[in-house]
């Protein structure tokens, strides 16, 4: 099964997967415009307003928290997961993040044990890293996903991450240290 997302004349199909009672996109969001058609600006530095970030020669997209808070990033009928959505997924898979992970993972710190994952759920979390300091940081070592409380239009202080060093769910701070602006993470949407 797939969903079709059409924005500004561009069409993108995302495969979907059911895990427990939840329906998730099996790929990270790849939008360059909001659902209403407003262009989302490509950025290279954090702290310069809402935007997306894309390392050269890749199909990887990161979005800063400012873009997430603008709304309308998720395809119609879908949303950026809230803390309860992530908690329900965590409980259903018994905190075994390895069954969500796929691709070539590396450890965060030397001496850590590697967990490459089995992707038994078909969630397909790849270790794409995050965006910061004008570049892709920690590729092959982690992936961080946005969490959004749509009711309050707020982002929690920490969001979900998976690392090559752990079979468990992890968390990552959403703000850049000692700054008022947000980091740039991947977006994985869930059906409303």
Residue ranges and their predicted role:
Residues 1-192:
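Conserved positions within compact, well-structured domain cores
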């Amino acid at each position: 099964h797939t969903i079709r997302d059409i924005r500004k004349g561009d069409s993108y199909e995302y495969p979907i997967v059911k895990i427990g009672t939840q329906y998730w996109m099996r790929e990270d969001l790849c939008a360059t415009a909001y659902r209403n058609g407003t262009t989302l600006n490509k950025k290279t530095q954090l702290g310069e307003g809402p935007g997306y970030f894309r390392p050269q020669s890749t199909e990887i997209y990161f979005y800063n928290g400012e873009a997430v808070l603008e709304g309308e990033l998720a395809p119609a009928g879908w949303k950026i997961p809230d803390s309860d959505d992530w908690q329900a997924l965590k409980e259903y898979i018994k905190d075994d993040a390895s069954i969500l992970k796929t691709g070539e993972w590396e450890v965060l710190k030397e001496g850590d044990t590697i967990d490459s994952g089995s992707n038994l759920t078909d969630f397909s979390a790849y270790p794409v890293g995050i965006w910061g300091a004008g570049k892709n940081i920690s590729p092959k070592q982690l992936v961080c996903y946005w969490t959004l409380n749509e009711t309050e239009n707020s982002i929690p202080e920490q969001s979900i991450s998976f690392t090559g060093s752990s079979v468990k769910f992890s968390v990552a701070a959403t703000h850049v240290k000692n700054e008022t602006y947000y980091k740039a993470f991947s977006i994985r949407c869930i059906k409303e």
